[in-house]
């Protein structure tokens, strides 16, 4: 089991990351693997491999997100809570927005 909170805390330390949510997405080999949905700081750029390298230095290999999707914002409730179920269920639709 992987704690998304632990992975998110590490990724938030990257200077380009403003917000992040990590969810488990289907994976052929492991059944489910961590995937990072990232909102970048204004003017920042970040390649997926750069974020993975950053995470690899700070996390066990199996906890490093296997993928990354950059979004303009994370889906949230009216009270500001991140809607991870939306990210899990609509990765393709969200990425297209």
Regions found by a protein language model. Give the residues of each.
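Acidic/polar alpha-helix N-cap and adjacent early helical turns
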Residues: 89-97
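AMP-binding/adenylate-forming catalytic core of the ANL superfamily
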Residues: 1-63, 69-75, 80-89
